[in-house]
Every structure is written in structure tokens, then in C-alpha cells.
């Protein structure tokens, strides 16, 4: 997806229904917001969190969109906007004592990465 904002071209990539808590993903997203593409790749590769893998896929997808569709060089890209939104809850039941059922909610999240080029 493309956005024109103050004559700057912004390239967007979305990751939907990621089976992870938005709170845990935000912890990693806050570390890469505003950084260059290469620096974000290095951080996401070596951080010890499970949330890094889906974020890395979305960041790589946004960079591939920018380079393939608009001819941007990956060395000039930076993450101008990164956000995590709450997705739908998967509701499950866990069997408990005496025939009861205990509700369990499995959260999901949406990851949005916006990349622009420094010129």
C-alpha cells in the first residue's frame, strides 16, 4: 500500500492475525521505530524475543515492496512508523475439576510497518 504524505512516498506492510499478545510485540516494535532498515534487521535478528520473527517478516516485506515497486535502495530506507494493534481473540475452554470449563483467551495482533526513503 502506498501513501503520499507531504511529498514523501510511504510504503506500508501489514501482518494480520499474528498469534501473539500485542503487549509483547510492542516491546520489540518500540526498539525499531525510527531506525534505518539495516539497523532494524540487525536488532531483530539478535534480540532474544519470540516476537522478533513475525516483525522481521513484515519489515522485510515492506522493504521488498519499496525496492521492487518504487525502485528505492534498501540502504536509504528507514522505519518511519511502526505500530501494533489488537486483533481478534481466540476463545478456548480448558477442562477443570468437577466438569467445569475454564475460559482461555488467545490474543492476536496486527503489525503495521511504514517505510520511507531518506533522500
From Swiss-Prot:
It is found in: Plastid, Chloroplast. It comes from the Eukaryota. It holds the Pfam family Ribosomal_L22. One of its GO terms (biological process) is translation. Belongs to the universal ribosomal protein uL22 family. GO terms for molecular function: rRNA binding; structural constituent of ribosome. Keywords: Chloroplast, Plastid, Ribonucleoprotein, Ribosomal protein, RNA-binding, rRNA-binding. Part of the 50S ribosomal subunit. It comes from Spirogyra maxima. Its main location: plastid. InterPro entries: Ribosomal_uL22, Ribosomal_uL22_bac/chlpt-type, Ribosomal_uL22_bac/org-type, Ribosomal_uL22_sf. This is Large ribosomal subunit protein uL22c. One of its GO terms (cellular component) is large ribosomal subunit. The gene is rpl22. This protein binds specifically to 23S rRNA.
Amino acid at each position: 500500500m502506498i501513501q503520499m504524505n507531504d511529498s514523501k512516498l510511504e510504503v506500508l506492510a501489514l501482518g494480520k492475525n499474528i498469534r501473539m499478545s500485542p503487549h509483547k510485540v510492542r516491546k520489540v516494535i518500540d526498539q525499531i521505530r525510527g531506525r534505518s532498515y539495516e539497523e532494524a534487521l540487525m536488532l531483530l535478528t539478535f534480540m532474544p524475543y519470540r516476537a522478533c520473527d513475525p516483525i522481521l517478516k513484515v519489515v522485510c516485506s515492506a522493504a521488498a515492496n519499496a525496492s521492487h515497486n518504487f525502485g528505492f535502495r534498501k540502504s536509504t530506507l528507514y522505519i518511519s512508523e511502526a505500530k501494533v494493534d489488537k486483533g481478534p481473540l481466540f476463545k478456548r475452554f480448558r477442562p477443570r475439576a468437577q466438569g467445569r470449563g475454564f475460559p482461555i483467551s488467545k490474543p492476536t495482533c496486527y503489525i503495521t510497518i511504514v517505510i520511507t526513503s531518506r533522500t
